[in-house]
């Protein structure tokens, strides 16, 4: 039953179309030393508990004979960096992917949306929500290093975008991570549509 909530979240993500063509990966902290993460190449809308494998948070070592998701290093970094994090969700939605490419700077700044309050600690729509945008890379260790350097300057909150790739977000548990994902996806779609209207 430990993975039941995460399995349900993965199926919900699949139904939303936020992880098409087996894209994305989802994980849950198992204990201080390890996490469960989706096996590579599986449809996230049809997962069950057997589709997750255990990965060591410090070393990234996985169960022999099974291949963890490509971005496993991002998940294990977040579990090391934030001991309070209990779940990480990485998705490939259209709005997150488009906005990550359209954003000219290294940070997507959102303000004026009531749904900003879906993010833990946000209490006012006038406050700015800053989501870091990183260049995509197939070199995950190098990407993790860049993310860690940026985090040392401006601590990450809620999630970050990878250009042309998608969103990675997290929470203290599956429920909070799912709430952050849904809130951010709503905000991204609003911002995308706002920019389209202003460009006309």
From Swiss-Prot:
Protein known as: Methylthioribulose-1-phosphate dehydratase
Matching PANTHER family: METHYLTHIORIBULOSE-1-PHOSPHATE DEHYDRATASE
Record-linked HAMAP family: Salvage_MtnB (MF_01677)
Keywords: Amino-acid biosynthesis, Lyase, Metal-binding, Methionine biosynthesis, Zinc
GO biological process: L-methionine salvage from methylthioadenosine; monosaccharide metabolic process
Cofactor note: Binds 1 zinc ion per subunit.
Listed pathway(s): Amino-acid biosynthesis; L-methionine biosynthesis via salvage pathway; L-methionine from S-methyl-5-thio-alpha-D-ribose 1-phosphate: step 2/6
Family note: Belongs to the aldolase class II family. MtnB subfamily.
GO molecular function, one term: methylthioribulose 1-phosphate dehydratase activity
EC number(s) on file: 4.2.1.109
Pfam families in the record: Aldolase_II (PF00596)
Function recorded in the entry: Catalyzes the dehydration of methylthioribulose-1-phosphate (MTRu-1-P) into 2,3-diketo-5-methylthiopentyl-1-phosphate (DK-MTP-1-P).
Catalytic reaction annotation: 5-(methylsulfanyl)-D-ribulose 1-phosphate = 5-methylsulfanyl-2,3-dioxopentyl phosphate + H2O
Gene Ontology cellular-component annotations: cytoplasm
Residue positions binding Zn(2+): 90, 92
Co-factor(s): Zn(2+)
Origin organism lineage: Bacteria, Pseudomonadati, Pseudomonadota, Gammaproteobacteria, Enterobacterales
Organism encoding this protein: Sodalis glossinidius (strain morsitans)
SUPFAM superfamilies per UniProt: AraD/HMP-PK domain-like
């Amino acid at each position: 039953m430990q993975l039941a909530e995460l399995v349900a979240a993965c199926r919900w993500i699949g139904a939303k179309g936020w992880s098409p063509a087996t894209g994305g990966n989802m994980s849950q902290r198992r204990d201080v030393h390890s996490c469960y993460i989706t096996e590579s190449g599986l449809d996230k809308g049809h997962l069950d508990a057997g589709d997750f494998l255990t990965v060591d948070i410090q070393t990234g070592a996985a169960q022999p004979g099974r291949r963890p998701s490509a971005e496993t290093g991002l998940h294990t970094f977040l579990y090391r960096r934030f001991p309070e994090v209990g779940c990480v969700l990485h998705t490939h939605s259209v709005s997150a992917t488009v906005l990550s490419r359209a954003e000219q700077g290294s940070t997507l700044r959102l303000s004026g949306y009531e749904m900003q309050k879906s993010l833990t600690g946000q209490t006012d729509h006038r406050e700015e929500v800053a989501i870091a945008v990183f260049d995509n890379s197939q070199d995950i260790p190098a990407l993790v290093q860049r993310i860690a350097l940026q985090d040392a300057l401006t601590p990450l909150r809620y999630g970050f975008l990878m250009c042309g790739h998608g969103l990675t977000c997290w929470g203290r548990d599956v429920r909070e991570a799912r709430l952050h994902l849904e809130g951010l996806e709503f905000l991204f779609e609003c911002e995308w549509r706002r920019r389209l209207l202003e460009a006309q």
